[in-house]
Amino acid sequence: MILSIESSCDDSSLALTRIEDAKLIAHFKISQEKHHSSYGGVVPEIASRLHAENLPLLLERVKISLNKDFSKIKAIAITNQPGLSVTLIEGLMMAKALSLSLNLPLILEDHLRGHVYSLFINEKQTRMPLSVLLVSGGHSLILEARDYEDIKIVATSLDDSFGESFDKVSKMLDLGYPGGPIVEKLALDYAHPNEPLMFPIPLKNSPNLAFSFSGLKNAVRLEVEKNAHNLNDEVKQKIGYHFQSAAIEHLIQQTKRYFKIKRPKIFGIVGGASQNLALRKAFEDLCAEFDCELVLAPLEFCSDNAAMIGRSSLEAYQKKRFIPLEKADISPRTLLKNFE
């Protein structure tokens, strides 16, 4: 088995993945959402301290699941990039300690690659080549994945990420963090879902394949300010619905532009923001239009987790891509290449 560790942001997670058939044997996770909610976003120093507290607790649960028999573990895998430096280092320190004390090889894994492999948790075979939309609090990307060592970034956001824009809109409406499920609930509760959109679709006439949410976010801010003295539930629902609809339509329009160029046969959607049901439905319709198979990450493995890191690290294990402890380090940025 591979013991994998994830601590790139505000989720502490450990998992055990069986090498022979890629079966997820155990998955443990502690979310920090309630600790960051009052701040409207993740506070790195708080996240780091909580990882230092939570990771040892999760390791104890791993010990119990193994009956304290670590002989079944053949490698340690850790997310080392991209992410918050102060949280990545907490996971790396645990991984190094386990690697040294158990005399096991160490695998460094890219967090974005891990999200791609969340599509294949519990599956021995992957479905590559495929194209992937990654939407989360930190990223809005289209990726092309040909194999483990050949994953390229085709499109990215020029400013805010998809998930980050939901967080900021929720904060404008004084509704808390994380904003994704809050804004989604507003949209679901809105009583007039078929009216024309009140916010502009970003980059609608731009020839560039990219994402942008800052203009849409600013349009929401102006609407909130206009209704400052009458920001009741119905107004909040209306803003939430129209913002979400415009944000998803932007993703659809840009991805459709990509589809017309590349005509992918398989398209995956991953990342924490991919739990949004309206987004999933919109992409079901888009993929049906282009006769493209849609593959969705399971809802429980959309947000950051060690199970996806365990699944991706199986590929590294087979290729013996091990890193000496003295060379193991972290990076706040991904090393995945931009498409050339």
UniProtKB/Swiss-Prot annotation:
MF terms in GO: iron ion binding; N(6)-L-threonylcarbamoyladenine synthase activity
Coarse class of the protein's main subcellular location: cytoplasm
GO (cellular component) term, any one: cytoplasm
Broad EC category: transferase
Cofactor note: Binds 1 Fe(2+) ion per subunit.
Record-listed E.C. numbers: 2.3.1.234
Catalytic activity reported: L-threonylcarbamoyladenylate + adenosine(37) in tRNA = N(6)-L-threonylcarbamoyladenosine(37) in tRNA + AMP + H(+)
Top-level lineage group: Bacteria
PROSITE patterns found in the cross-reference section: GLYCOPROTEASE
Cellular localization per UniProt: Cytoplasm
Keyword Calcium: no
GO biological processes: tRNA threonylcarbamoyladenosine modification
Keyword annotations: Acyltransferase, Cytoplasm, Iron, Metal-binding, Transferase, tRNA processing
SUPFAM superfamilies: Actin-like ATPase domain (SSF53067)
InterPro entries: ATPase_NBD (IPR043129), Gcp-like_dom (IPR000905), KAE1/TsaD (IPR017861), Peptidase_M22_CS (IPR017860), TsaD (IPR022450)
Cofactor: Fe(2+)
Keyword hit for tRNA processing: yes
Annotated NCBIfam families: gcp_kae1, T6A_TsaD_YgjD
Function: Required for the formation of a threonylcarbamoyl group on adenosine at position 37 (t(6)A37) in tRNAs that read codons beginning with adenine. Is involved in the transfer of the threonylcarbamoyl moiety of threonylcarbamoyl-AMP (TC-AMP) to the N6 group of A37, together with TsaE and TsaB. TsaD likely plays a direct catalytic role in this reaction.
UniProt protein name: tRNA N6-adenosine threonylcarbamoyltransferase
Organism: Helicobacter pylori (strain J99 / ATCC 700824)
